[in-house]
Swiss-Prot record:
This is Histidinol-phosphate aminotransferase 1. Its EC number is 2.6.1.9. It comes from Bacillus cereus (strain ZK / E33L). Pfam families: Aminotran_1_2. Pathway: Amino-acid biosynthesis; L-histidine biosynthesis; L-histidine from 5-phospho-alpha-D-ribose 1-diphosphate: step 7/9.
Length: 370
């Protein structure tokens, strides 16, 4: 028995190491996980309240249409309920879109590096993947446009981008949307939207009416702190969303996920407090990078990508032995960098002290051999 040939070329997704795994491996009692861009402040207290009322529903199938959540998300965003497609996290939404649109003979255009699942699902569906290197850490939309042809079904734009935290500014996106063929679906993956505060960061939802080939993805996993519950959604053209519903599994979002997402959505004050604290945390890293002359990408997310002057895998291992889990840039094809999730203030302070040690050791080593 053999699976599709294209599956043999892929590897299963490898998430960052979990806390218990690292404790066992290194004999540590305290672990700080700053690898998966989770919200260090948790989730709204309203989520806990919502969970206590669900016990009587455990034996029942969920609302397959997610009516209440759909209604409130549409109201929050100012869109029609028919424009929303819900999934078990954005991973499933990406899978649904890829399954519905891609096949052998088609192609997708994306940046490199960017979120890995765009590439993964394109390969599974037999589509050609056309990757364009980032320019100064940012999507090179001009170069990406050159890769688009009549067989391009999807153009993926991760904005802000994972793993660099950078963003495509409004005017460049508008120029791209005007130039790209209407036959290509331009998907803006805005998983980190709530953290993006730059003045020229594009607000894409108002653009949906003009550009029918535009789609926006958002999630409750990041700023809302609901990663464990797996719920995200797409916003797009009503006709296309209706067609994509056919590819959605029945009851794909659980009663629990729908309920906690609704509770989290209602507590915008908690969300804004998380965003504020995250911005303060980013500035802790910026101050370190500037003082120690460490390269970094200014971030519009809850993580920062930086280069310490040593291989990312080495930095990853050395930090992990101290009880701090980060993500090596090697996982994204940037061998000399690491990605660090912004944590609590004290967590940021602690890991920054370790980063200083790594930088100082490297400087001393270079001076010895110079």
């Amino acid at each position: 028995m053999r699976v599709k040939e294209q599956l043999l070329t892929l590897r299963a997704y490898v998430p960052g190491k979990n806390i218990e795994e690292v404790k066992r491996e290194y004999g540590l009692s305290k672990i700080v996980k700053l690898a998966s861009n989770e919200n260090p402040f948790g989730c709204s207290a309203r989520v806990t309240e919502a969970l206590t009322s669900l016990a009587s529903q455990y034996a029942l199938y969920p609302d397959g249409h997610a009516f209440e959540l759909r209604t409130q998300v549409a109201k929050h965003l100012g869109v029609k309920v028919e424009q929303l497609l819900f999934g078990s996290g954005l991973d499933e939404v990406i899978q649904m879109i890829s399954r519905a649109l891609l096949h052998e003979g088609t192609n997708v255009v994306m940046a490199n590096p960017t979120f890995s699942q765009y590439h993964h699902h394109a390969v599974i569906e037999g589509a050609e993947v056309r990757e364009v290197s980032l320019k100064d850490g940012i999507h090179d939309l001009d170069a990406m446009l050159q890769q688009v042809d009549d067989q391009t079904k999807i153009v993926w734009i991760c904005n802000p981008n994972n793993p660099t935290g950078t963003y495509v500014e409004k005017q460049k996106l508008l120029s791209f949307l005007e130039a790209v063929p209407k036959s290509a679906l331009v998907i803006m993956d805005e998983a980190y939207y709530e953290y993006a505060g730059a003045e020229d960061y594009p607000q894409t939802l108002p653009l949906l009416e003009k550009y029918e080939n535009l789609m926006v993805l958002r999630t409750f996993s990041k700023a809302y702190g609901l990663a464990a519950f797996r719920i995200g959604y797409a916003v797009g053209n009503t006709e296309l969303i209706g067609q994509l519903e056919v590819a959605r599994l029945p009851f794909n979002t659980s009663t629990v996920a729908q309920s906690v997402a609704l509770a989290a959505l209602e507590d915008q004050a908690f969300l804004q407090e998380c965003v504020k604290k995250n911005e303060e945390g980013l500035h802790q890293y910026y101050a370190f990078c500037k003082e120690y002359n460490v390269f970094y990408y200014p971030s519009q997310t809850n993580f920062i990508f930086l280069k310490l002057g040593i291989p990312g895998n080495e930095a990853f291992e050395r930090l992990m032995k101290k009880g701090y889990i980060v993500r090596s840039g090697a996982a994204f094809g940037i061998d000399d960098g690491i990605r660090i999730t912004v944590g609590l203030k004290e967590e940021n302070d602690e890991i920054i002290e370790l980063l200083k040690e790594l930088v100082n050791e490297q400087v001393q080593k270079e001076e010895t051999y110079s």
